[in-house]
Amino acid sequence: LRSRGLGDVYKRQMKRIGVDLVDEHYYMAPDWFFANAARYDDYDRKGPKVFAGEYASHDHPTGKANNFLAALSEAAFMTGLERNADVVRLATYAPLFAHVDAWQWNPDLIWFDNLRMMRTPNYYVQQMYGMNAGTDVLNLQMDGKPVTGQDSLYASAVLDAPTGEVILKLVNAGSRSEKVQIEFSGLKKRQLVSG
């Protein structure tokens, strides 16, 4: 089932008929992505799993797409996807490619012409997450809650078991730099590496 997200009525219906996986699509403004970083935190763990099959941040009224704010909002949203990997099984940015002289919609991850390609800020967010995936989601909290926009900060953490690396993704959507202190608890010493 493809949707723009499941409301309560649809969630109950999908669970009742035994749907295993729903395909949710989000083409929304940056504010929506920031506001929905905690979207799956309270999701029914026994309900259908989620394929975030198409998502991209854009601001069509202003014509701004593939800018830094859009990429930042996607990075914030992706902390929630990663934190809830038990529910969100798959995710993909869309659309991926567009020719600068013949495109159907905007935004796109990579633009190209007959001689070259241009990677967008959104591309680099996807690359950062793709190159820093983990095997186990770690519980990361600020003041006892997931980091989903408090003080304009968003975060997720994973462990890459084969390498022993703890990988932290931290998004600062605020207008000023923030001093952040990370404390680890519950990890065995061999699981912590510097780098």
Residue ranges and their predicted role:
Residues 28, 95-98, 174:
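Glycine-rich beta-alpha junction loops
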Residues 36-37, 64-71, 105-112, 170-171, ...:
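Composition- and surface-driven signal marking solvent-exposed, interaction-prone regions
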Residues 20, 53, 89, 191-194:
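A short, local hydrophobic-aromatic micro-motif
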Residues 1-10:
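Single conserved hydrophobic/aromatic residue that forms the stacking wall/gate
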Residues 47-155, 162-164:
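Aromatic/acidic polysaccharide-binding cleft in carbohydrate-active enzymes
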Residues 151-189:
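Carbohydrate-binding surface patches
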Residues 11-64:
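Glycoside hydrolase catalytic-domain groove-lining segments
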